[in-house]
UniProtKB/Swiss-Prot annotation:
Family: Belongs to the ubiquitin-conjugating enzyme family.
Biased composition annotated in UniProt, kind: Polar residues: 710-728
Region described as Disordered: 1-23, 123-155, 649-678, 709-728
Signal sequence coordinates: none
Annotated catalytic residues: C495
Gene assigned in the entry: ubc-17
Matches recorded under PANTHER family: (E3-INDEPENDENT) E2 UBIQUITIN-CONJUGATING ENZYME, BACULOVIRAL IAP REPEAT-CONTAINING PROTEIN 6
InterPro entries: UBQ-conjugat_E2_core (IPR000608), UBQ-conjugating_enzyme/RWD (IPR016135)
Protein name: Probable ubiquitin-conjugating enzyme protein 17
An annotated GO cellular component: nucleus
Regions of compositional bias (Low complexity) in chain numbering: 1-17
Basic and acidic residues bias spans: 658-678
Pfam hit, one: UQ_con
């Protein structure tokens, strides 16, 4: 037993020994692998740290190598772009030639073209995407939805925040890429280097000039500087400042100035002579008018305005200096668009006197006007649909300051963006003390049943603006008796996806990046259309059929009468106080067209009701109201008589203009008389001098002859007429 026990114990100890050895071996292996893993991890961390610092300047690398290593990265990081601008700026002008020779500038210009957000970048959209858009926007698909009510599926997902964020990232990249280019051309910041002499820019060789001139830089400048929306510019100050700095950097190089002066395509405009002067004028005029509202803490905008003035003047002066070297026939003839001031209206009326030109010149100063909506003790003194909402808001509350500034920016922008022509126009009236209270007047477009009519709206910006849409109400309803459109109810409600009053696709709904201008254009373009009958969802099934066309024609006949009666006649008889001048002048300028329109309606109704079929009125529309041909025709005849008896609202202005012209003519004639009298006096004095000269000459000659006679011999000289004779 003892031997067996000893054998078992020895075998157990042997097993235990082997187990311990195996454990030690595993432990050693784990330690070895652990050390190997740790060392590899440390090396990876070190390499990653080196990479994270890259492309931190390596002392052994030149500036060219540093810049090349950065701009060749995929994707290009913002932090590295900032370093590149510093590297390029620190290099001397003579050393910058290497950037051109090594292809750095060529690659940089390609990156700028790829990053630019503009119309020409949209043209590179894939063919498949274009087909998808065409299918989505085709008339066939839209005709089955009801205009203005939204199209497509309401379940579609569209992340507006992500879209805007991506755009801002690209815009920031473009801003700094342009800054790198400016660092190369002139130096950065550009405003500190404007006094650099052209002969110092030795790196701007013919190759560098050709690279920049042939790149997308000119098209980017031309596209973005066309923008006259103050709201858009104020929201993207950095990119516009970079664009102006790029133009100034190019203007510092004499070889690039011609490309700023001459339009780069037949459809483009001169950057230096048209776009930049207009951009500067818009910014300065808006800042002067709205500075008190935009103000207070907005030093950023004030600084931007100062830079706009400095950089614009630099470019304009460079363009003028260049054109002084050209013969007059080779200089670029441009006509910079200018909004007229609020004085001297008729002095602006130069050029052809067609109806379109006359309408614009007469109505332009009335398009954006102010009025007093708030009376004593902060009470509204005009009719207003959203009176209760306006009363419950303290416009001077600190938490509404951003809302007020946003509204002011939008109003400043629409001054240059509102449509104005004889066919269709938009007029806006607001109170300078309460910019959240707005009244709008929209004229009906030609070739629609709303032609020449004037339709009034009340608009209010709620406290949640711009995160919630503005509130809009339609006022031209004939005291609730007429519904002008399936989208416009006789109680003033407006059905549009952008206003949140109807379901629509996410991209058709309101978002914080929408604006008042989009709402106004949507109302004008989506509601006041040629065939409003098909705006009603469900009626689209008749579109393209004989029955549908007949329904639409008869519906339009009723809308035309409502327009003539309520949007023209009632406006003429009882104009809104704040739009009275607009209404009177609009109707006077369009009276001939309205008379033809009224007579055409009478003829169409007479033709229709001469038909027995039509007189039975088998087809009745649910949304037709007050159909009475005899009464309606009588109303239109009254309108014709009232228009024919209408007195010109321009009579006072025309009398003043006539008086001014007479005064100018009288002053001109008086000036001519004075000039003629002065010339006559000069001629008289001239004749007197000539006679005096002749008398003196005769006297001298006579004296000389007398001397000769008394002295028979001797040599005598003839004295000068102007000199006194010694003998005399």
């Amino acid at each position: 037993m003892s031997s067996q026990a000893s054998q078992r114990s020895s075998s157990t100890s042997a097993v235990a020994q082997k187990t311990r050895e195996r454990r030690k071996s595993k432990s050693r292996r784990r330690c070895w692998f652990g050390c190997l893993w740790l060392s590899s991890r440390v090396s990876l961390i070190r390499s990653s740290s080196r990479f994270s610092r890259s492309p931190e300047p390596d002392e052994s690398l030149t500036a060219i190598d540093k810049v090349m290593s950065i701009i060749n990265e995929k994707p290009l990081k913002m932090a590295h772009i900032l370093k590149t601008a510093r590297f390029v700026n620190d290099v001397s002008f003579s050393e910058r030639k290497q950037f051109v020779e090594c292809g750095v500038i060529h690659h940089l210009l390609e990156l700028i073209g790829e990053t630019a957000i503009s119309d020409f970048s949209a043209s590179s959209r894939s063919a498949d995407e274009q087909k998808r858009r065409a299918r989505r926007n085709s008339s066939a698909s839209l005709s089955h939805k009801g205009t203005g009510y939204g199209t497509g599926s309401t379940r579609s997902r569209w992340d507006i925040e992500r879209t805007v964020e991506e755009k801002l990232i690209r815009e920031e990249h473009l801003t700094w890429l342009l800054s790198i280019l400016n660092s190369f051309m002139l130096g950065w910041p550009t405003t500190d280097n404007l006094k650099t002499k052209p002969e110092e820019l030795v790196h701007m060789t013919e190759i560098a000039i050709k690279l920049i001139a042939d790149s997308s830089v000119l098209s980017i400048l031309e596209y973005n500087l066309r923008n006259d929306s103050f709201f858009d510019v104020s929201e993207h100050i950095e990119i516009y400042q970079a664009l102006l700095e790029t133009a100034a950097s190019m203007a510092a190089t004499p070889g690039l100035v011609p490309f700023l002066v001459r339009p780069y395509t037949s459809s483009a405009k001169s950057i230096a002579k048209e776009l930049i002067p207009r951009f500067k004028e818009n910014i300065l005029s808006i800042q002067a008018r709205w500075g008190g509202t935009l103000e207070e803490t907005n030093f950023r905008m004030a600084e931007f305005t100062a830079k706009v003035t400095l950089l614009s003047d630099y470019v304009i002066n460079a363009a003028r200096a260049y054109e002084q070297t050209l013969p007059p026939e080779q200089r670029i003839q441009t006509a910079t668009h200018r909004r007229p001031s609020h004085s001297g209206l008729h002095s602006k009326m130069q050029g052809p006197k067609d109806d379109e030109t006359i309408y614009k010149n007469k109505m332009q100063e009335l398009q954006l006007q102010t009025a007093k909506f708030i009376g004593d003790f902060g009470k509204l003194c005009v009719p207003y649909v959203f009176r209760k909402e306006a009363k419950n808001i303290n416009p001077f509350s600190p938490h509404l300051r951003d809302r007020t500034k946003r509204i002011a920016k939008e109003l400043a922008s629409i001054a240059n963006a509102l449509p104005l022509n004889a066919s269709n126009s938009i007029y806006v009236c607001y109170d300078e003390g309460r910019v959240d209270i707005i009244k709008v007047l929209i004229s009906g477009p030609d070739d629609t049943p709303y032609a020449n009519g004037l339709f009034e709206f009340d608009i209010f910006f709620p406290t949640g603006y711009p995160f919630s849409p503005p509130k809009c109400a339609f006022l031209t309803t004939g005291s609730g008796n007429v519904r002008f459109n399936p989208n416009l109810y006789n109680d003033g409600k407006i059905c549009l996806s952008i206003l949140g009053t109807w379901e629509g696709r996410p991209e058709e709904k309101w978002n914080p990046y929408c604006s008042l201008m989009q709402v106004l254009v949507s109302i004008q373009g989506l509601i006041f259309v040629k065939d409003p009958y098909f705006n009603e969802p469900g009626f689209e099934r008749y579109q393209g059929t004989d029955r549908g066309d007949e329904y639409s024609r008869k519906y339009n006949l009723q809308i035309e009468h409502a327009t003539l009666n309520y949007a023209i006649r009632e406006q003429l008889k009882k104009p809104s106080e704040h739009f009275k001048e607009v209404i009177e002048k609009h109707l006077w300028l369009k009276r001939e067209a309205i008379l033809k329109q009224a007579q055409a309606w009478i003829d169409n109704v007479s033709n229709d009701f001469g038909d027995d079929k039509m007189s039975k009125r088998k087809d009745v529309f649910a949304f037709e109201t007050g159909f009475n041909p005899a009464t309606q025709e009588r109303v239109i005849h009254n309108l014709i008589q009232e228009l024919q008896a209408m007195q010109s609202p321009f009579a006072k202005e025309e009398a003043e203009e006539s008086e001014r012209l007479k005064r100018e003519q009288s002053e001109k004639e008086e000036k001519q008389k004075k000039e003629a009298a002065a010339l006559a006096e000069i001629e008289r004095e001239k004749r007197e001098l000539e006679l005096d000269f002749q008398r003196r000459r005769s006297s001298v000659l006579a004296t000389h002859v007398a001397v000769i006679r008394t002295q028979p011999t001797g040599d005598y000289s003839v004295p000068s007429v102007n000199e006194p004779s010694t003998s005399s």
